[in-house]
Structures are given as C-alpha cells and as structure tokens.
C-alpha cells in the first residue's frame, strides 16, 4: 500500500465527530497550556496522559498530539503580546513579535506567526509521511559526536550571526552554561555550583528562569519606561488577517529555509528551541531588511515560528520509527505509547498500521484546526492590549508567579523567578542580549553530556569530531558559522580590492 493510500485510510479513521471533537478540545487545552508561562507542552501532555488510559490508542494520541499543536500555537500569543514566552521555543518570536505589537501591529504579528506555524508543521508532517524510512536510517547513524556537533552548530550560528557584539554574546552564553551546570554531574556524580544547598541538587529550573528573565525583567524595564498600551493599536479585523496573508507569499524563501532547519533539528534532534534561534539568525543574516530586525520585522516572526513547528512535528519521526523521542513532549508521548501496549520502532508501521496513519492524518487536520481556533481567539487575546498597563502589569506578575509556583509547587521558585527577573533587568540595562543566555541554559547540559560521552568514547581525542563525513560536515558547518563575520569581511575586502584593480587596469 502506498503512502497516499495509507494516508487516505487514516483520514477516514480520523474524520469522525468523536475524533474531531477531541481535536478541538485538545487544541483549546493546548492553547491554554501554551499561554500560561512555566507550564508548557511537556507538562500539559503529562497532566493529560492519565485521562487517556481508558481511551483507544488512536483517540488518545489524537487528543495528546492536538494538545501539543495547540501549545505550540499558544506559546506565541504571550510572546508577541507581552514578551513572555509561553514555550521555551517561542523565545525567538519575542524579538520582533513584541516590537510589532508595541507598534500597533499585533494582528499582523499573530496572523503571520500562526500561518507560518501551520506551514512549518505541514512540512514536518509531509516529511513524516513520505520520508520516514529514509530519515530513520539517517538518524540511526547519530551517536554522541554527531549530537554534540549539532548543538555546537546551534551555538556557533547564534554567535556568528548575532547583531550584538561577540564578546557580550559570549558573556551571556557563559552565564547560560553556568546555569545549565548547576546540580549533580551526570557522568561523575559530583556536585557543581550547589553551595551545599539541597534544593540545587536537581539544578535550576529553566521554566522559572525564563519566566523571570523575560516576564519580570520586561515588566521592570517597561515600568521604568512608563509604557502605556493603547487600545486602538491592537485592532484586529478579518481585513487585517487577509492583508497579512496577501503579504506573506513574498517570504517564501524564509519559509522554506526555516522549515528545512526545523525538520533537521527535529529529527537529529536539536529541538524546536535551537531550530527557532538558528532560523531567526539565518533570516536576519539573509534578509533585505536586516536593519529592521529587533524593531518589528514580520520576517523575524515568520522564521522562528516556521522552524519551531516543523521541528516540533519532525521530532515525532524518530519516536515512531526508532523509539527515540526528539523532544521532551515526544518523550511523554513515548511513555503513553508504552502504557497503551504499543512498541515504537520500524515494526510499528506494520503491526499498528491504523494507529500510525491515524496519527499522521490527525497531524494534518489537527494543525488546520489549531489555526482556525487560534485565529478565532486573536481578537480576545489582542484586546488585552486595550487595558491600561497599570492594570495589566500586576496581572502579568501574578500569572508569572503562578506559573513559577506550579513548576514544583514551591514558593522558592517564586523567589528564584524574582531573582532572575532582576538579572534580566540588569542585563538589558547593560546591553547584554538575553537570547544567547537562554539558548545556552536550554542546550548546555545536553551539549556537555554529548561532548563528555564523545571524549570517553575516543579516549580524549578531539579528532572524533572529524572521524566520519557526517560529523565532519556538522563540525565544519559550525566553524563556518562561527567565523562567518570574519569570512564575510575578508571576502568583501578581496572583492573591493579586485574591483579597484580592474578600474586601475582599465
């Protein structure tokens, strides 16, 4: 049976009133989870998982996957309206989404984000539909050196293509690495940066840190600036949506590049967060309007949202074909599959044909349903901007505190949130970028584990990162990204010298 025939069979299974109702419920719950800072898709799916034990596997996976898509969509809402990422992967969306909202373009930013998210997700689903066996064979070749090279590529891309001074970017990234190092060493078992405090044994909570750095830090800066949101700047109408859709086709190359980056990072897996940062950096580097990035450029919203959703969708590919989760949410879903008596791997496509293709079909329909539902809620969420900021600020602080408290149900997390908020405010005042810090905090421990495992495997030989064509190409790409500014300047100087020589010769 061909992929198309299998997909049509899956569509016939999913297109029932019961399953469509589960899609809408899952999307609505996911949007709520994505909007609330600190909760996130993995926690939301984990909380919902026990409720699926009495369902059939197809119904259960439809509910959980649609909650996942809704959370990815919802994470961009608070990122754009309040500069508070609902999801770690939505951090890059704040760079231009929030300035667009402040410039009175909240509707355009949200519409561009949601539409790009749908297109990115569909690319990921197409990859899963038609290239699953080939991608699974490719991902099977990855070991610790390849994983470290992928993370190194993410770090170097952000350093080499950042518009901030490289030294400040490195300092911010170093702080993030230090945050990621707190707790117990996973290799030796030694304690690092715990200062004899038991509550630091498990490390710093990323959710609490990002709520403080972005949420509280932004509130402090905004209060100092005396910002007041004006209602007329957040007017959302169907005409705004249609006008935004009319503009978006001109960014097809950004869409394509970001979708490919997202698929790559989802399958390898680098994750949606790294994919969104890399895509944003690449979009800024190659854009004709790069000077507008950070000031409210719609291309700066399109790139991270496309990559985020293509990576989030592609992350399910290694889970289904190899049993290797490509993201935290995929890991929770993997646990659900095991509980339901399913065993992910190459045989899953044969033994559980209806389940697999029902899931793939629900990915197509679920993302379309997500776009429709979230666009219908745009006026509701955008109307928040009409409320005076003196009223909104305490509400945001309260929501941040609830989100921080919900991570471990501990007041200590609320205190840490406030401390990270002060750090975020200080970094912003001194001109240090927060995004590299967040990237390093998210991927630092994973990169360290991959590096140390590579060193153990190779007896401490760095040549392991050039030991085969795959890891060598990844490492070479990382170094090229790191040295990109220098290479670009040298190439420009040589080009100008050549033009002068030609003029003199003439």
Locations of regions flagged by a protein language model:
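Helix-loop-helix hairpins and the membrane-proximal interhelical loops
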Residues: 1-60, 133, 139-140, 191-297, ...
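Transmembrane alpha-helix interface/packing and boundary motifs in multi-pass membrane proteins
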Residues: 27-41, 70-83, 158-163, 260-271, ...
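Transmembrane helix-bundle signature of multi-pass membrane transporters/permeases
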Residues: 31, 47-50, 64-72, 113-118, ...
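Re-entrant/interfacial helical elements at transmembrane boundaries that shape
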Residues: 41-51, 64, 79-99, 130, ...
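Flexible loop linkers connecting adjacent transmembrane helices
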Residues: 47, 81-109, 134, 143, ...
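Membrane-interface alpha-helices at helix entry/exit sites of multi-pass transporters
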Residues: 58-62, 99-116, 288-301, 328-331, ...
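A structural-propensity feature for long, helix-poor, extended segments
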Residues: 68-80, 86, 297-322, 326, ...
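Membrane-embedded alpha-helical modules
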Residues: 111-227, 339-489
């Amino acid at each position: 049976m061909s992929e198309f025939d299998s997909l049509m069979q899956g569509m016939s299974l999913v297109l029932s009133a019961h399953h469509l109702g589960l899609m809408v419920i899952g999307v609505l719950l996911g949007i709520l989870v994505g909007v609330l800072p600190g909760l996130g898709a993995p926690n939301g799916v984990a909380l919902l998982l026990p409720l699926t034990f009495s369902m059939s596997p197809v119904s259960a996976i439809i509910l959980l996957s649609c909650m996942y898509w809704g959370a990815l969509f919802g994470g961009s809402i608070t990122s754009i309206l309040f500069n508070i990422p609902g999801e770690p992967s939505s951090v890059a969306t704040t760079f231009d989404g929030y300035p667009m909202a402040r410039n009175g373009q909240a509707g355009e930013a949200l519409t561009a984000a949601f539409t790009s998210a749908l297109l990115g997700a569909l690319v990921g689903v197409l990859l899963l539909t038609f290239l699953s066996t080939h991608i699974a064979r490719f991902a099977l070749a990855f070991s610790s050196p390849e994983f470290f090279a992928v993370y190194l590529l993410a770090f170097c891309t952000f350093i080499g293509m950042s518009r901030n001074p490289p030294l400040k970017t490195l300092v911010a990234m170093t702080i993030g690495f230090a945050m990621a190092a707190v707790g117990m060493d996973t290799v030796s078992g030694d304690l690092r940066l715990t200062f004899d405090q038991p509550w630091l044994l498990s490390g710093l909570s990323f959710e609490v840190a990002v709520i403080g750095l972005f949420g509280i830090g932004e509130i402090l800066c905004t209060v100092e600036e005396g910002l007041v949101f004006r209602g007329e700047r957040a007017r959302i109408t169907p005409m705004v949506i249609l006008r935004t859709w009319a503009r978006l086709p001109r960014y097809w190359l950004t869409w394509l590049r970001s979708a490919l980056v997202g698929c790559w990072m989802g399958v390898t897996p680098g994750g949606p967060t790294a994919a969104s940062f890399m895509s944003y950096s690449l979009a800024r580097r190659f854009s004709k309007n790069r000077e507008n990035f950070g000031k409210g450029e719609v291309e700066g919203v399109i790139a991270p949202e496309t990559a985020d959703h293509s990576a989030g969708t592609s992350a399910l590919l290694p889970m289904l074909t190899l049993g290797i989760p490509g993201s935290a949410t995929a890991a929770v879903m993997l646990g659900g599959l095991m509980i339901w008596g399913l065993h992910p791997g190459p045989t899953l496509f044969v033994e559980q044909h209806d389940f697999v293709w029902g899931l793939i079909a629900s990915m197509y329909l679920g993302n379309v349903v997500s776009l429709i539902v979230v666009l219908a809620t745009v006026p509701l969420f955008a109307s928040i901007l009409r409320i005076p900021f003196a009223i909104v600020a305490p509400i945001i602080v309260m929501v941040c505190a609830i989100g921080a408290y919900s991570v471990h149900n501990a007041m200590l997390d609320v205190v840490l949130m406030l401390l990270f908020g002060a750090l975020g405010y200080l970094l912003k005042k001194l001109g240090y970028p927060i995004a590299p810090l967040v990237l390093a905090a998210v991927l630092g421990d994973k990169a360290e584990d991959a590096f140390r495992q590579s060193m153990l495997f190779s007896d401490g030989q760095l040549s392991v990162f050039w030991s085969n064509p795959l890891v060598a190409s990844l490492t070479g790409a990382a170094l090229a990204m790191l040295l990109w500014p220098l290479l670009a300047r040298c190439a420009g100087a040589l080009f100008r010298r050549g033009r002068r020589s030609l003029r003199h010769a003439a």
